[in-house]
């Protein structure tokens, strides 16, 4: 009975800690192997002044995999960093994780030792909590952990870095974290990451990763000269590794220098053969080459053979991506679009449906999948009714993203064409009413709704 009571007390204390076991890190179980690879790469390649957090996250992921000995080893590496760098506040997450891990291993005495270490630091900094310290350093640690665990965590990660920056506005690491997570969320045309990236580069002038992200954002804005300068600086850096090269490859692919992008990706894959993201980027390169062939004026007889060959290469790369990251929904979508290009319609439809079946889709991704699946149905399967259904489902996801606006445009175009061609006239006119309502143009919306009602009356006098 006493042992259970001790266990209950230890658990009560553990729940007060700020560490990876208590932060609500959202990711799918299927993502854990790829997450482990990405964390290992970040520890190895990404020039972070303090890799302590990545060792801690690696330990947590290994714990989730049931690899308790390996998890303990990662925490020992983190503890070694604490001792060598004389860290105090930032040691709290490590010691908290150690306490949790020993608890799960059944070592209550060991767990209590680490709880005592946390308590000592909390007392040192006059925390009102016995096992918890509110400080910028811990906000930063939590922010990095959330950032690394994927899109479902980005808003919370941004809040953590913003909170830390209120305390130290010029801190280089806090600005790095804030800029990176802003970039990851900057998927619309409001460019929320541009100034944070500029500031982070100013505070971290030797960081090639930040430079390549800034280059990509400048490319979005059409600032090509400045973007190219940052890319050249990033690639010439002595610390430039595969984590930087993959983003540089994205820059060159978007610049239509696909051969250069493929060269960089192959170079990065030699260092990181288990990176799902690198395979995905290669797939996008082959997909872009297919589009270039389709729009080329050069009508060579072998062009269709080239399309088939490129399609198979793209599909292979997306399949490799999904072996490593089984829940990466956009790999399914891009593979489906390539399959549609070579008339593999059944396979394409299955992959679109797999992408939509992911229950953890963030809003703008869900909207984008509905848009691209709808286009497939409209233009490849000639099924406008089903396409309209998908556009409407996407618009029900209410976040006003870039994808949401493209859905609205797609619905407007198909409705206008159907009205002109007198196809399902009442329904099509009503759809135009909905389009204008969603645009906020109430007067136009009312016009089309009333027109639809009049058409209904003409077609069905008994109504």
Curated annotation (Swiss-Prot):
MRNA binds at residue 144. Interacts with EIF3C. Interacts (via TPR repeats 4-7) with EEF1A1. Transmembrane segments: none annotated. GO terms for molecular function: RNA binding; RNA sequestering activity. One of its GO terms (cellular component) is cytoplasm. PROSITE patterns: TPR, TPR_REGION. It is found in: Cytoplasm. RNA binds at residues 250, 281, 325. It comes from Mus musculus (Mouse). GO terms for biological process: cellular response to interferon-alpha; cellular response to interferon-beta; defense response to virus; innate immune response; response to bacterium; response to virus. TPR repeats lie at residues 52-85, 92-125, 138-171, 174-207, 209-241, 242-275, 294-328, 329-362, 367-401, 426-459. This is Antiviral innate immune response effector IFIT1. Pfam families: TPR_16, TPR_8. InterPro entries: TPR-like_helical_dom_sf, TPR_rpt. Plays a key role in the innate immune response as part of an interferon-dependent multiprotein complex, recognizing and sequestering viral RNAs that lack host-specific 2'-O-methylation at their 5' cap. By distinguishing these RNAs from host mRNAs, inhibits their translation by competing with the translation initiation factor eIF4E. Disulfide bonds: none annotated. The lineage of its organism: Eukaryota, Metazoa, Chordata, Craniata, Vertebrata.
